[in-house]
From Swiss-Prot:
Name used for this protein in its record: Acetyl-coenzyme A synthetase
Gene that encodes it: acsA
Catalyzed reactions: acetate + ATP + CoA = acetyl-CoA + AMP + diphosphate
GO cellular component terms given for this protein: cytosol
Binding residues annotated for CoA, in chain numbering: R189, G190, G191, K192, T307, S519, R580
Example GO BP: acetyl-CoA biosynthetic process from acetate
GO MF assignments: acetate-CoA ligase activity; AMP binding; ATP binding; metal ion binding
Keyword Ligase: yes
Length: 644
């Protein structure tokens, strides 16, 4: 099916699905618009509060406080409250390891017991309310256990993605001044191992705030244990007291800090607080995924990213759902691993990224056809815009043509889903995230700050505060204002572009700033450039994202070498390794083009738009009148052609 045909076809919710859906009344949009504070207050009451709030929203742009005066605990809502409602013996987490046959299941009662013990471990290590804890773990149950233990005692957690380098870990620990680091000996993924403890040891050479390191024995690999600092998880848990009451947290107390790529290169510590965030992810998990008591829900993200925080841990568990966690990759040890997992565990809801879907398309439906996926009833997409052809393929081959597809738009900053179909109500168009959810007020603005009404293209904004919104950037309120609020005043600027069609559907077009989206991972161009320039052979580098049918975008680096040195394949490989070491494997450039010069304006600014056009093979380079040396473009065209 061509992109054009796919993008004009529409799909109504299947009748049987719609009749049982959690949200069946389209009037919910109007109800939320009429009294959106009342709407969110009603949703918040689905949670357990030790004390109800005095005020739903206090808004002093750009600072929002939700459920002011309310007392709540995220861990209590995800565990104790579920046990009280009779879910103690229900499976909370089904864990599937990297190697087939490695499985673990934790019921709500079992998860609660583990969390209470680890909360006491943290207290015993001197962690108090307000102290940050860094977590650098593979996708194992100890990761959500550590997060929920932090939430239980009021210690903000800062999870660092396991593929990040020692330097990235060090920078994040130092920024949040974590007191304790929780890591593992190593992390298996796709048959390979990441030396997490060795990376942590390197990072800890320069992290003055860290007092203790807790190490999970995941693989049994031999690791260096520093006496007096490093402690084994299993030994601490063996001695831990079994009961730890949940702290009564203010609604606006910090739940976690999660670092995201910024256009300046310095990672941004995005701060999410407790009451508003939990309300947002609890509601969106229930409504967007239409959760039922017997669902087995699988979000394939890593918990190191916000999708895992919101839609593996806090959203599903606060709804009493059964969530599946997978440590491995789609293709190890065979390319039908995911379909085998779905069949064996009876997965009913699958939430994954377009990158994975495009990889499966390349293999064809063969691996899927070996398995019975009839348990699936809903499919979701996250991380980047999904192209219509991938949407159609997902719907037809994975969902058997019967499962609604919810294409979701949101960000680390928004905390939870913002634009998405409601699967029992919304007529979907492949490639469109459809409409802002009830209680979310999205709009499209032009560069001058005028709102575009009706069909049009511009910058995607959110016009009113919402409960899951980031409250600030950790220790950097100025950057918070500058990044999200300076452009349009009281309106949140997302950094994404969008188009609205004649039916009011939103089509997200991707980043408009200097952040690249590779397989749903946001990577700062400035961060990659500074990693490249740190190599002694590199004089200057410019990094752009070009379209890639597998990963959405691919990283391309244009590199000027010192002293007229010639580039070669060996040096290109060395530079990729340099980026891997400084940032992580996910940020390695797919293509490195050596060039004697870069297209710059007379003021010295690199014109990345021209580099992007050249990389994508486009002849129309737009306005080039501001170039200091137009001849550079011709020479670059030759360099690009030679590199292909």
């Amino acid at each position: 099916m061509t992109e054009e045909k796919a993008s004009v076809r529409t799909y109504d919710p299947p009748e049987e699905f719609a009749s049982r859906a959690n949200v069946r009344d389209p009037g919910v949009y109007e109800e939320a618009a009429r009294d959106y504070e009342g709407f969110w207050a009603e949703r918040a009451r689905k949670l357990h509060w030790f004390r109800e709030w005095d005020e739903v929203l206090r808004w002093d742009p750009p600072e929002a406080q939700w459920f002011v005066g309310g007392k709540i605990n995220a861990s209590y809502n995800c565990l104790d409250y579920q046990v009280q409602q009779g879910r103690g013996d229900k499976r909370a987490i089904i864990w599937e390891g990297d190697e087939p046959g490695e499985n673990r299941t934790l019921t709500y009662s079992e998860l609660k017991a583990e969390v209470e013990k680890f909360a006491n471990v943290l207290k015993g290590l001197g962690v108090r309310k307000g102290d940050a804890v860094s977590i650098y773990l593979p996708m194992i149950p100890e990761l959500p256990i550590a997060m929920l233990a932090c939430a239980r005692i009021g210690a903000p957690h800062s999870v660092v993605f396991g593929a990040f380098s020692a330097q990235s870990l060090r920078d994040r620990i130092n920024d949040c001044e974590a007191k304790v680091l929780v890591t593992a000996d190593s992390g298996p993924r796709g048959g390979k191992r990441t030396p997490l403890k060795a990376n942590a040891d390197e990072a800890l050479e320069d992290t003055p705030s860290i007092e203790k390191v807790v190490v999970v024995r995941r693989t049994g690999d031999e690791v260096n244990m520093v006496e007096g600092r490093d402690l084994w998880w299993h030994e601490l848990m063996r001695e831990a007291e079994p009961e730890c009451p949940a702290e009564e947290m203010d609604s606006e107390d910090i739940l976690y800090i999660l670092y995201s790529s910024g256009s300046t290169g310095k990672p941004k510590g995005i701060v999410h607080t407790t009451g508003g965030y939990l309300t947002h992810v609890n509601t969106t998990t229930d409504w967007v995924f239409d959760l039922k008591e017997d669902d087995v829900y699988w979000c394939t993200a890593d918990i190191g990213w916000v999708t895992g925080h919101s839609y593996i841990v806090y959203g599903p568990l606060s709804n009493g759902a059964t969530a599946l966690m997978f440590e491995g990759t789609p293709s190890y040890p065979a390319n039908d691993r995911w379909w085998d997992i779905i069949e064996r565990h009876g997965v009913t809801i699958l939430y994954t990224a377009p990158t994975a879907i495009r990889a499966f398309m390349k293999q064809g439906p063969g691996p899927i056809e070996k398995h019975d996926l009839s348990s699936l009833r809903l499919l979701g997409s996250v991380g980047e815009p999904i192209n219509p052809r991938a949407w159609e393929w997902y719907h037809e081959h994975v969902g058997g043509g019967r499962c609604p597809v919810v294409d979701t738009w949101w960000q680390t900053e928004t905390g939870g889903i913002m634009i998405s179909p409601l699967p029992g109500i919304t007529r979907t168009k492949p490639g469109s995230a459809t409409f802002p959810l009830p209680g979310i007020f999205a709009g499209i603005y032009d560069e001058e700050g005028n709102e575009i009404e009706g069909p049009g293209v511009g910058n995607l904004v959110i016009k009113r505060p919402w409960p899951g919104m980031l409250r600030t950037l950790y220790k950097d309120p100025e950057r918070f204002r500058e990044t999200y609020w300076q452009k349009y005043g009281d309106v949140y600027f997302s950094g994404d572009g969008a188009r609205r069609d004649e039916d009011g559907y939103f089509w997200v077009t991707g980043r408009v700033d200097d952040v690249i989206n590779v397989s749903g991972h946001r990577i700062s161009t400035a961060e990659v450039e500074s990693a490249l320039v740190a190599h002694p052979a590199v004089a200057e580098a410019a990094v752009i994202g070009r379209y890639d049918e597998d990963t959405g975008q691919a990283i391309v680096a244009y590199v000027i070498l010192e002293g007229g040195r010639e580039g070669n394949d060996e040096l290109a490989q060395e530079l990729r390794q340099q980026v891997r070491k400084v940032i992580g494997a996910h940020a390695r450039p797919q293509e490195i083009i050596f060039t004697p010069d870069l297209p710059k304006t007379r003021s010295g600014k690199i014109m990345r738009r021209i580099l992007r056009s050249l990389s994508e093979g486009r002849d129309d380079l737009g306005d080039t009148t501001t170039l200091a040396d137009p001849g550079v473009v011709e020479s670059l065209k030759e360099q690009v052609a030679a590199s292909r």
